[in-house]
Regions:
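Interdomain helical connector at the RecA1-RecA2 junction of SF1/SF2 helicase-like NTPases
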Residues: 92, 100-176
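Conserved P-loop NTPase motor "coupling/switch" region that bridges the ATPase
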Residues: 9-10, 31, 39-42, 48-132, ...
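Conserved helicase ATPase core of P-loop NTP-dependent helicases/translocases
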Residues: 201-203, 211-212, 218-254
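A conserved SF2-helicase RecA2
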Residues: 273-362
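Conserved helix/coil segment N-terminal to the catalytic DExD/H
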Residues: 7-31
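A short beta-strand element within the Helicase C-terminal
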Residues: 28-33, 75-78, 258-271, 294-298
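Conserved interdomain hinge at the start of the Helicase C-terminal
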Residues: 172, 177-205
């Protein structure tokens, strides 16, 4: 934990990680803020259960995240539950229905759409840019984001297959990644080493990928899960300060909450189905304060086509969700956040319209 102490008793502010919650007495705090609160999106997650139990009686609560529901709208329910608005089960019963015969799939009721977003806007706000609150975006516009896809040809068939084919199941996708580690690392290292003056962030998914990348890329330093908190903290600080050029790590370790605007190059050598991890990882460099165009390189084997396609689908769905929430709740959000609403003038005709004779004839 990183405590910021005050001389006034009872007014201390403490900043800490979720995994250190057990070291604190929740009753000693009058307010709690969950940053990167998407960690509570799963209704059965251990983190959500611990936080619900710890801060049930806390007076002031705030959740902040760019991806509150990276998979579907029902995940908004866990945020409502933590904030004390209602339980996720109550939200589902009120606004959602089972979609067909699959009882695990929930669909927003057609007649409840407007009511649902109005309800969400009473306790949540989707603010992506100043114009969402009625302000000018000119000082907030990000530089261009360039995506480069690199496909490694895979000739070796997956287990049980006669010919090489695109992986479909999760186990097949992991097998495909393992079989193409050497080729993907080689292609990535070639590009990273060719830009010796550019700081790079290189993301991996498997330990074997991280180890191989660190060896193949000149000056690369890896942050692994097995490293101590002290080692991770020091290496993160060193990379941000420019003490080494290339950082290799997993999105699950370094993909959230960090600011690396000094880097405009990024590579994904391990691609998973998690759009949230991908989105958050990209945003470490492509964020407010970035002055240059950002280039993202994605390395995947030809057998991982289903993974890349699924990631793109989730990106489209997430964009559509953000657009819908912003459009549906804009007026309510402006009222609750800025105290203003959109003003319109209604025209009430004082005289009846006289239709010209030639229009009557045409009709």
């Amino acid at each position: 934990a990183l405590p910021i102490l005050s001389e006034t008793p009872g007014s201390n502010i403490v900043i800490t990680n979720y995994d250190r919650l057990h070291r604190f007495d929740p009753e000693a705090f009058s307010g709690v803020v969950l940053d990167e609160s998407s960690c509570i999106k799963h209704h059965d997650s251990k983190t959500l259960k611990l936080l619900l139990q710890a801060f049930e009686q806390t007076q002031f609560k705030l959740c902040a995240t760019a991806t509150p529901a990276p998979n579907d709208w029902t995940e908004l329910g866990t945020h409502a539950q933590f904030l004390g608005v209602c339980t996720q089960a109550e939200m589902l019963a009120e606004y959602f229905t089972h979609d067909g015969g699959d009882t695990s799939v929930w669909r927003l009721k057609g007649h409840a759409r407007e009511l649902f977003w109005t309800w969400v806007s009473q306790w949540g706000a989707m603010v992506r840019k100043p114009s969402d609150l009625g302000f000018d975006d000119s000082a907030y516009l990000l530089p261009n984001l360039h995506m480069h896809e690199h496909t490694v040809k895979t000739e070796m068939p997956l287990n049980g297959m006669l010919f090489a084919a695109e992986a479909q199941t999760l186990s097949e996708r992991r097998d495909a990644r393992r079989m193409s580690v050497e080729d993907r690392v080689k292609d990535c290292a070639s590009i990273v080493n060719s830009e010796a003056s550019e700081p790079w962030v290189v993301w991996c998914d498997l330990n074997a990928e991280g180890d191989a990348l660190t060896k193949a890329i000149n000056g690369a330093v890896q942050i692994a899960g097995a490293d101590s908190h002290e080692v991770k903290e020091q290496r993160l600080a060193d990379f941000a300060a420019g003490k080494f050029r290339v950082l290799v790590s997993k999105p699950s370790i370094c993909g959230f909450g960090l600011n690396w605007q000094h880097s405009a190059r990024m590579a994904f050598v391990g691609v998973t189905d998690s759009f949230e991890s991908y989105y958050q990882a990209v945003r470490r460099c492509w964020r407010f304060g970035q002055k240059r165009d950002v280039h993202i390189h994605v390395f995947a084997s030809s057998a991982e086509g289903a993974v890349v396609a699924n990631l793109k689908r989730k990106e489209r769905d997430a964009t559509a969700m953000a657009e819908s929430l912003s459009a549906e709740t804009r007026d309510a959000v402006m009222q609750s956040v800025t105290g203003t609403t959109r003003q319109t003038n209604t025209y009430n005709a004082a005289k009846s319209v006289v239709v010209p004779s030639f229009l009557k004839a045409a009709a």
